Amino acid sequence: MNHHDIATIAAEPLLVAPTHAHAMLEALRREPSAEAYDHTLDVAAVYGVTPSAPEKPYAFADGVAFIPVRGSLMNRTTASYSWVTGYKGIIQRVAAAVADPDVRGIVLDVDSYGGEAAGCFECAAEVRSMIRESGKPSLAMVDSNAYS
């Protein structure tokens, strides 16, 4: 199965590494599992966040909001698991960090082989605009496989 076939099956244009398109589609077919949730908790724990930590929609430590962007990127969803992140979810978490007076800086931690083209550029523009208007410093830590 090639990259074009995957985009046809997904019914959406993709911005994804061709070598990972098939794996992405297979991951999206699976239901979220307890293992996926546990992995999400493991990612949060890297930043010192545990389930008993104060409720924020992002990892938070020392005045910095850490927003993980993991797995396949999807339009029109707020999902945030180790294997999929929704563009709407990214926007919501950045908006929350911008509005949170405890947050002095924002880090987007990106580890993704890409995802849907639809929504990608709109998400980037919205995130850029919100952070710029907030005046809060930000940066993105990008894995070598940040495709979209």
For each feature predicted by the language model, list its residue ranges.
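N-terminal organellar transit peptides
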Residues: 1-148
